[in-house]
Amino acid sequence: MTLRPGERDLAESLAANALAFLAAEPERLERFLSLAGIDPGGIRAAAASPGFLVAVMEHLMSDEPLLLAFAANEGIKPERVVKAAHALGIVPWERGFA
């Protein structure tokens, strides 16, 4: 996939917003951390991993109500989240998100 200049940066920014969205509600964050196998005390170390933002976006993409809530919170169409996920290298139909 060919990215336009700045597209990956925008996708990473949206993924960081998604993490903040998850962190805003303890239940959301706990579910993400549990499914990702991350201890709450290890979130800072995990966040330094190159794949962390990808994991955040994969989590959103795997839960349609959560994806829709995030998109509404951001004031964007859900398709924008999908495009950001693609820019981060996530191919939804290969991971069962279709």
Regions found by a protein language model. Give the residues of each.
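Metal- and O2-centered redox machinery and metal/ROS homeostasis
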Residues: M1-A98
